[in-house]
Every structure is written in structure tokens, then in C-alpha cells.
């Protein structure tokens, strides 16, 4: 099983089994693989597969997948429908990402996915379960909500965040928040737009540090 990265290093022996059980432990009802048979041509011909170019079952990948299947069959449906219930959530929104990436004038170093990962990584390393949810989802069951680069504020989000904080939740905002509405139009009256009262700040100017 290969990663599909600039350097496609193989997963170490037992690593696939480990991350498969990790997924199941976090609520996954199925573990699926792409692809069954390795392609013979085109750009993905070296992409990992269960059945490799050799065409038989005499390789580590096939054996490890077969072992996992045997083990999961023994477990059966005992874990189906089980769910982890984290108390921490990170808001991540694709429209927000596209709007940030489509804007010019501040800094090309603004990186929405990386900003989210900077919050996720230490939580993961500390074994703190985290849900990654859309900005318009229900926040009532969380104790901590992190909203990295909440540049776009969709309808209902302001009220939802304010209610979450009033109910005792802890909200973490980062740079570049509250700038536009759901149509990527700047909310006039001062940054951070609809989140001014919630954040308790008014941003007069933006500036960017050079690398």
C-alpha cells in the first residue's frame, strides 16, 4: 500500500492494520481500499493496490489485507454504529477555503488548510479526539470549538457561535476572521465584521510580515 505523495514511501509492516483499526475505533463502519488491481498504464500505474503487477497473492500487501479481512470478519457487526463523541471541534469549510484562496492583497502565505492543521496536530498528539465539522453544524455538544481563519461567516453562524459561548463553551478564533458574508462580500463597518462584538475587538489595519 503506497502513499500518493511527492515521495511515495511504503507503509511499514503492520502500519495499514494499525490505521485501519484506528479508523474503526473512531467510528468507521467500513475500511475500504483503492485500488483492487494495480493499473498497467497511465499516471497511476505505480499507485498501490491489493493485487500488484505480479498478479498473485505472494506479496506483503495482499497478505496484510487478507489478514485484516479475516480479523474484521471475526469481529463481525459488534462495532457497527458505534461513534466517538469528541468534546472538541474544528470548523472547516470549503467555501471559506475557496474564498480565501481567491482573494489577493494580503499575503500569499495565508494557508487555510495548514492553519487548521496547526490546531489539529497538537490535539492529535495529545490523544484528544476532535471532530472536523462545517461552520453551520450544531455546536451544543462541544466544550471547545476552534474556528481557524473564519474569513467567511455564513447565515446563522454568528448567532450559533454567540450562543455557544453564552452556554459556557470556549471559542478560539484566529487571524482573518469575520471578513465577508457567504457571498464573499466584505462586511462593512469594521473588521472582524459580524464577529466584532463576539471577539471584543476592532481591527483598524492589516499588515503582513515578509518571510
Where are these regions (language model features)?
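Carbohydrate-binding surfaces of carbohydrate-active enzymes
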Residues: 1-211
